[in-house]
């Protein structure tokens, strides 16, 4: 029964992706369909129309496999060795700056959310 629930949870998450892809195709949006599906899921979870516990275990199992999807993109960088050696320091600086900005903005928004709930 546990595996059936896990399969059902992952299946529903996949359906959100398919619906998002369908919406993207029908309305010819430039946003990826999977992102539209994630936004729909986020809205339904944040408005508590769908409870988080319905997806929790399935999402945890999918997160285990997430690093496997990053390996091909990392190995693909080896094809651009000369570009990375010439522009690598600029790219590294941009990544560090964008990470710091993201951390600051996320922290600020988190603080706003915490103080607004009190």
Curated annotation (Swiss-Prot):
Gene this chain is encoded by: cidA2
Transmembrane as UniProt keyword: yes
Q: Which GO terms describe its cellular component?
A: plasma membrane
Q: What does this protein do?
A: Increases the activity of extracellular murein hydrolases possibly by mediating their export via hole formation. Inhibited by the antiholin-like proteins LrgAB. In an unstressed cell, the LrgAB products probably inhibit the function of the CidA protein. When a cell is stressed by the addition of antibiotics or by other factors in the environment, CidA possibly oligomerizes within the bacterial cell membrane, creating lesions that disrupt the proton motive force, which in turn results in loss of cell viability.
Biological process terms from the Gene Ontology for this record are:
cytolysis; killing of cells of another organism; programmed cell death
Q: Which organism is it from?
A: Bacillus anthracis
Family, per entry: Belongs to the CidA/LrgA family. CidA subfamily.
> What PANTHER family does the annotation carry?
HOLIN-LIKE PROTEIN CIDA-RELATED (PTHR33931), INTEGRAL MEMBRANE PROTEIN YXZK-RELATED (PTHR33931:SF6)
Q: Where are the transmembrane segments?
A: 5-27, 31-50, 62-84, 88-110
State the protein's name: Holin-like protein CidA 2
What InterPro entries does the annotation carry? Holin-like_CidA, LrgA/CidA
Return any one Pfam family short name.
LrgA
Q: Does the keyword Transmembrane helix apply?
A: yes
* Highest taxon, organism lineage: Bacteria
Membrane topology term reads: Multi-pass membrane protein
Intracellular or extracellular location(s): Cell membrane
Q: Which UniProt keywords apply?
A: Cell membrane, Cytolysis, Membrane, Transmembrane, Transmembrane helix
The main location class comes to: membrane
């Amino acid at each position: 029964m546990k595996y059936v629930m896990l399969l059902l949870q992952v299946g529903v998450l996949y359906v959100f992706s398919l619906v998002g892809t369908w919406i993207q195709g029908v309305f010819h949006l430039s946003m990826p369909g999977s992102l539209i599906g994630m936004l729909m899921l986020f809205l339904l979870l944040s408005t508590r129309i769908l409870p988080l516990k319905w997806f929790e275990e399935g999402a945890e199992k999918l997160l285990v496999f997430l690093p496997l999807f990053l390996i091909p993109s990392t190995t693909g960088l080896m094809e651009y060795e000369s570009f990375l050696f010439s522009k690598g320091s600029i790219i590294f600086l941009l990544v560090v700056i964008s990470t710091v900005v993201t951390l600051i903005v996320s922290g600020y928004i988190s603080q706003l959310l915490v103080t607004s709930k009190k």
